[in-house]
Amino acid sequence: MSEEVHPRADELDALGALDLARLMHDEDTHAVEAIAPHLPDIARAVEAVADRLRSGGRLHYFGAGTSGLIAAMDAAECPATFGVAEGTVQAHTALEPGQEDDRILGQDAARSASLRPGDAAVGVTASGRTAFVLGALEEATARGTFTVNVTYTGPATDVTGFVEVYETSPRDGSIDDIVRVAVTIGR
């Protein structure tokens, strides 16, 4: 679960500013170190998305709650940062209470986006199990859209953080390639 209390956070309110800054820095450093071994696979996903954008495809983010807000911020920055046309990168979010648990709402969001085989759909979900995001990625896969699910879950759960790349064939919708990259972040 993404909503667990971090063991080093028991007394955050009692820490001085310097100790708090050190704690946050240490945790950020652990996250960066955990990602490093998986950079080739992450780069593969980035290249696949970039190829689609260069070929006239679009990038659609799907996220709920804070993950959705982060996806929306990234989508808003893409035109200025990467020079893509406005509207090429879009975020579809579930921000109202309970929407994150609605798989059908995610499927509907993907349908409303008019996803097609030349597009990319990126799900962003802390738990890896957010129904809205999974529903959107299911619909995207059914439409032959390239999908990536970026997620984080703590090491205490059965599911570790991972990036999943599902390459689908526009001809028959079958999954040609699956890459699972285990990334345990934090503690």
Task: Go through each PLM region and give its residues.
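Cofactor-/ligand-binding subdomain signature composed of acidic, glycine-rich
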Residues: 1-38
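Structured helix-beta-strand junction loops
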Residues: 27, 55-56
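Catalytic, metal-anchored helix/loop core of enzyme active sites in primary metabolism
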Residues: 1-12, 50-53, 62, 70
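Glycine-rich phosphate-binding loops that contact phosphosugars or nucleotide phosphates
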Residues: 59-180, 184-186
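Short secondary-structure boundary/capping elements
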Residues: 12-16, 41, 98-105
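A short, well-structured juxtamembrane/interface segment
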Residues: 37-54
